[in-house]
C-alpha cells in the first residue's frame, strides 16, 4: 500500500470502514506487473502481443453488452451520489462521455485505454511503475488527494507466492 497511508491515518479520518471508492482503499495496482511476470514465466508471446487484441477492441470499439450496461448504470448512480464528475472525473470521461450513459448495443471506444495497454505492452509494464504512466498516476493521485506517490509505484514488484492450501474432506 502507499507509504503515506496507514491504519492509524484512516482511523484519524474517523472512518468506521474503508470506503469502497475514492483514494482511501487504493493500493499500488499489481495487475500490469503480474501480467508481465506471468508472460515471462509461462508465455510464448510478448506482453505487447498478449495485450494487442484488448487494445484493438478499446480502439475500434465493441457493442456494449446488457450486463455491462447495467453495471455502468449502477456505477453512474453510485458515483453521482458520491461526488459526481467533479470527484470521479476519469470515470465519467471514460464511461459517460459528455455526461451521456451508453445503452445496450452502443459501441464503446476508448482510445486512452488502447494507448495505455499498448504502452504497458511495449515497456513490459515498466512505464506503469517507473515511466510516463507512473508519473501520470502519481501526479493525479497527489492532485486529487490520494496517498500514492511515484516511489510507491517504483518499488512495486509482483511476485509468485505459494498459495494457502488446506485439506478438504480428508
Question: What residue spans do the PLM features occupy?
Answer:
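Noncatalytic scaffold domains of N-terminal-nucleophile
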Residues: 1-124, 128-130, 134-169
Amino acid at each position: 500500500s502507499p507509504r503515506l497511508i496507514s491504519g492509524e491515518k484512516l482511523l484519524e479520518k474517523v472512518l468506521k470502514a474503508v470506503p469502497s471508492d475514492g483514494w482511501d482503499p487504493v493500493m499500488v495496482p499489481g495487475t500490469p506487473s503480474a501480467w508481465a511476470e506471468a508472460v515471462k514465466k509461462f508465455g510464448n508471446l510478448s506482453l505487447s502481443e498478449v495485450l494487442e487484441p484488448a487494445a484493438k477492441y478499446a480502439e475500434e470499439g465493441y457493442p456494449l453488452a446488457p450486463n455491462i450496461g447495467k453495471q455502468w448504470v449502477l456505477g453512474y448512480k453510485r458515483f453521482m451520489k458520491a461526488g459526481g464528475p467533479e470527484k470521479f472525473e476519469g470515470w465519467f470521461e471514460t464511461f459517460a462521455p459528455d455526461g451521456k450513459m451508453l445503452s445496450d448495443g452502443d459501441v464503446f471506444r476508448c482510445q486512452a485505454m488502447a494507448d495505455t495497454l499498448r504502452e504497458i505492452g511495449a515497456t513490459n509494464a515498466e512505464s506503469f511503475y517507473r515511466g510516463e504512466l507512473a508519473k501520470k498516476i502519481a501526479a493525479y493521485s497527489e492532485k486529487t488527494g490520494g496517498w500514492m506517490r511515484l516511489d510507491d509505484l517504483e518499488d512495486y514488484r509482483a511476485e509468485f507466492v505459494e498459495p494457502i492450501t488446506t485439506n478438504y474432506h480428508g
